[in-house]
Amino acid sequence: PAIKRVFYPGLASHPQHGLASTQMKNFSGMMTFQTHEAGMAIARRMVKQLEIIHYAVSLGHLRSLIYWIGTDDIEQSTFRHGPEAASRFRDYMGDGVFRLSVGIEDGDDLWADLVRCF
């Protein structure tokens, strides 16, 4: 499979699923995932091949949006770790993650759009 790891509190396998269940009625339309293949290569394909999902940085839109962010960018903009913690973070995160904000389009159409890029 192309997907290595999914971060979504609506999944029973998510480490904070229990907490999310008490805080969210229907979880959310935001999820993050990693791929086995280099994320930047997939992101470049997405820019050319996506027909329904828009490759853009934003939140809270009716349209579905996806964006890839590299681990270097995540570390520079969000986290401040000591060297040992930074090393563990990089091992866990790989080269980066995709953030998908699901809009109101049909789920089967969105799935087909994503599959085309992998």
What is the role of each PLM region?
Residues 37, 64-118:
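PLP-dependent enzyme catalytic core of the Aspartate aminotransferase-like
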